[in-house]
Amino acid sequence: MSIFASAFTPISVSSAKENIASAEKFILFIGRPSCPYCQLLEPRLSNVARKSEFNIFYINSENTDELGEIQALRKRYGIATVPALFVSEKGAAKVVCDSSLSEEDILDFIS
């Protein structure tokens, strides 16, 4: 894996679905190294991951092996664009697609 998203745990779409279905808090970053907006958000999200106790998972939306599954996941949860920050817990899910989030905004969203 490249330096992009190195602070996150890579995960497959099928494993992400299993985590979403569990009651545990699950934090997922969907993005791609070639996306300029993802490149804007990723350093702040990485800092939050390093400074907090949260394990943030990552799906590279350019992964052609899982493209259909990624599109289905995005459609199901209304993830219109990347970068996307997705949080699920106890059957509830929320998503934000905003590359301008501050570290404080990110922490508020995932907490």
Please state what every model-predicted region is:
Residues 42-45, 71-73, 100-101:
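Short, glycine/charged-enriched secondary-structure capping and boundary segments
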Residues 15-54:
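Local sequence-structure signature of Cys/Sec-based thiol-disulfide redox active-site neighborhoods
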Residues 81, 86-111:
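Non-catalytic, surface beta->alpha helical segment in thiol-disulfide oxidoreductase systems
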Residues 64-82:
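Short Fe-S-cluster ligation motifs
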Residues 1-26, 105, 109-111:
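N-terminal leader/targeting and pre-domain segments
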